[in-house]
Structure formats: structure tokens, C-alpha cells
């Protein structure tokens, strides 16, 4: 149990498959119960999600950050298997994390949200589209991939889906808009609660300072967080 900058961080390490996947919990100051965000990492691994935690804590949200790679030995090299070979297993593991959060005495079980970045954007969409969380936001999320694409995450959506906000850039070199846009349109056709915003002149990983390919963009990083917080507030049970 570690206290850091006024926030309580609990590190939970799963050693057997009967336990939930590796995850960390972060709580804002106060007694709660708090709304919670399930924050989901990129294909560069679990460490990439940690930079997003501070903004949600400052807004009064607890944060759960599951590592959906470690148990399956997934790396950047075999990342496509996240959505094919291991898809159904990861679905179950993330549902279990949501259930764990809802059973946490510090959490308000009526207000659970998801946010994901790149690979994690796929899973944030899954959790909301399949009604496991109140709403989800996908930041430069995965909507398509070469050779083995199976129609997901667009296939998760239906007329009964909970709200999802997809944020994407029109200068993407990883999840190029020409491949993503048809999938976004499919999701929008299936669910009237699906919304999306395309940022002009913006590429992939806009919140990642070390990422050189598409470039860090502090303005879009801030705007994306603000839009996400507003979206969650709109879907909060009072």
C-alpha cells in the first residue's frame, strides 16, 4: 500500500489464473464512494496508461488500470492477437475487473466508466457497447487492423448499447482514418448513442511525449480529457 501525492495506490499482483488480472487502483482524496474509470493501455504495454491517471483523480474519479497483456504474454509484436486469439478471454477478464470495482466499498457502483488509448480504446468501446459500464471513450482507438480483422469492435454495438465517444485524428498513421471511418460509421448505424469527433491535423498517440511518429499535442490531450470528463458527467447517475 503506497501513499503518493495525496492519493492512495494499491498494487495488486495476480499470481494464479483464478484471480483477476494484474491491476492497480487509484483513489482521489476523500472518503467516497467515488465514480470510477477503468483506464485501458495501448499496445506499447501497461506502463502507457499511468500518465492518464492524474487527470481523472483530479476530477474526483477513482481509477482502475488493468493489464490485459501480461497473463497472455502479449507484446507489441503480437498485439493483433489481443482482438483475435485472446479476445474472448480478455472480455471475461475485463468484465471481472468491472465487477471488482463495483464491489469496492470506496466505489459508487452506479457510476462506472471506461477510457482506452489505441488498443485500450477497442476495449473501452467493448465495455460500454456491451453495457458493462455507463459510458466509454476511445482515444485514437483501434477500429481495424490488417489481415485478421473480424469486424470488432463495431460488432459489439447495438440499439441497446450504452454511450461511446470515439476521438480520432485525421492524420493518423497507425489507425488511418480511411480504414477507421467505415467502422465508426457501422457503430453509429447500430447505436444512436455512439458519438465521434475527428481532430484536424492530429495523429496517433497525441498524449505521448516520447512518441515521435505522429507527434505529441498538448492542446488535443487537454481537449480530449475535457471532452471525456464532460461525456462521463452527462452519463452519471445522480
Cite the ranges covered by each PLM segment.
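Short beta-strand element of the alpha/beta-hydrolase
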Residues: 33-42
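Cap/lid segment of the alpha/beta-hydrolase catalytic domain
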Residues: 48, 69-88, 205-211
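Gly/Ala-rich beta-loop-alpha elbow adjacent to hydrolase catalytic centers
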Residues: 116-120, 124
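C-terminal catalytic histidine-bearing segment of alpha/beta-hydrolase fold enzymes
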Residues: 193-238
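Alpha/beta-hydrolase fold nucleophile elbow
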Residues: 106-117
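Short amphipathic alpha-helix adjacent to the substrate-entry channel of hydrolases
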Residues: 48-66
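Alpha/beta-hydrolase active-site loop
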Residues: 83-104
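The feature captures the conserved acid-bearing segment of alpha/beta-hydrolase catalytic domains
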Residues: 135, 141-198
Amino acid at each position: 500500500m503506497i501513499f503518493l501525492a495525496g492519493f492512495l495506490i494499491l498494487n495488486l499482483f495476480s499470481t494464479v489464473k483464478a484471480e483477476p488480472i494484474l491491476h492497480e487502483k487509484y483513489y482521489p482524496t476523500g472518503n467516497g464512494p467515488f465514480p470510477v474509470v477503468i483506464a485501458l493501455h495501448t499496445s506499447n504495454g501497461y506502463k502507457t496508461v499511468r500518465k492518464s491517471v492524474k487527470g481523472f483523480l483530479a476530477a474526483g474519479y477513482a481509477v482502475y488500470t488493468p493489464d490485459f497483456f501480461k497473463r497472455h504474454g502479449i507484446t507489441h509484436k503480437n498485439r493483433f492477437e489481443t482482438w483475435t486469439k485472446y479476445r474472448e478471454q480478455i472480455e471475461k477478464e475485463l468484465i471481472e475487473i468491472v465487477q471488482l470495482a463495483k464491489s469496492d466499498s470506496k466505489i459508487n457502483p452506479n457510476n462506472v466508466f471506461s477510457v482506452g488509448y489505441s488498443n485500450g480504446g477497442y476495449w473501452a468501446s467493448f465495455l460500454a457497447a456491451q453495457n458493462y459500464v455507463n459510458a466509454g471513450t476511445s482515444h485514437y482507438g483501434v477500429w481495424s487492423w490488417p489481415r485478421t480483422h473480424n469486424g470488432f469492435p463495431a460488432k459489439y454495438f447495438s440499439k441497446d448499447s450504452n454511450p461511446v465517444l470515439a476521438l480520432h485524428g485525421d492524420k493518423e498513421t497507425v489507425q488511418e482514418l480511411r480504414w477507421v471511418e467505415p467502422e465508426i460509421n457501422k457503430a453509429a448505424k447500430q447505436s444512436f448513442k455512439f458519438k465521434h469527433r475527428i481532430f484536424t491535423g492530429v495523429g496517433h498517440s497525441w498524449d505521448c511525449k516520447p512518441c515521435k511518429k505522429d507527434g505529441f499535442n498538448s492542446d488535443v490531450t487537454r481537449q480530449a480529457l475535457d471532452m471525456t470528463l464532460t461525456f462521463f458527467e452527462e452519463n452519471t447517475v445522480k
